[in-house]
């Protein structure tokens, strides 16, 4: 039992470190109203391991925290809370949907990272830009969804 727990903690730590490292190395495209957070591709790992749920969540929190502290993340501490919560919900939902397979592939598990991030981060940017959530939300959500759609497409089996 101890070895299994240690393995899961280690896996979560490695995933968190990878998420943060990828995000921060690619900071110019990680933060912004139009972003491609390549590390969000790791939100598909919870399909394989429950440790990945905590790994991607911690990695996102580290990334958003460092981004807020350095000024790279314009949304600051709000994104630390909202963005990390969106990643946590996406990871949990991807894990749950990973059990539903078509042709042996968990196709539905790719949707939560796209949808949760588009809604949460799109709402953050809409509010930051306009002072309210209004029709501009759809433009921001669409821009945010483009990043996850691009990397999700690359991670799917052909």
Predicted regions and their residues:
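Conserved small/polar residues in nucleotide/adenosyl-binding loops
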Residues: 152-157
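Hydrophobic transmembrane alpha-helices
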Residues: 2-54
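Membrane-interface helix termini and inter-helical loops of multi-pass transporters
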Residues: 130-138
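Short helix-perturbing small/polar motifs within transmembrane alpha-helices
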Residues: 4-16, 20-21, 74-131
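Central hydrophobic cores of alpha-helical transmembrane segments
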Residues: 53-63, 109-114
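Individual transmembrane alpha-helices with interfacial aromatic-anchor signatures
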Residues: 137-150
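Interfacial segments of multi-pass membrane proteins
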Residues: 49, 62-67
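Membrane-interface helix caps and helix-loop-helix hairpins in membrane proteins
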Residues: 27-29, 72-77
């Amino acid at each position: 039992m101890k070895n299994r727990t240690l393995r899961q903690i280690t896996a979560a730590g490695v995933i968190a470190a990878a998420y943060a490292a990828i995000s921060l190395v690619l900071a110019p495209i990680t933060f912004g109203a139009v972003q491609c957070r390549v590390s969000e591709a790791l939100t598909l790992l919870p399909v394989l391991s429950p440790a990945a749920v905590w790994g991607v969540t911690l990695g996102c929190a580290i990334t958003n925290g460092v981004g807020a502290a350095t000024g790279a993340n314009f949304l600051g501490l709000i994104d630390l809370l909202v963005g990390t919560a969106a990643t946590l919900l996406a990871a949990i939902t991807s894990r749950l949907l990973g059990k539903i397979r078509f042709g042996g592939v968990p196709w539905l598990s790719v949707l939560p990272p796209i949808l949760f991030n588009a809604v949460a981060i799109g709402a953050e940017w809409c509010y930051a830009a306009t002072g309210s959530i209004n029709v501009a939300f759809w433009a921001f959500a669409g821009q945010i969804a483009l990043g996850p759609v691009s990397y999700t497409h690359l991670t799917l089996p052909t």
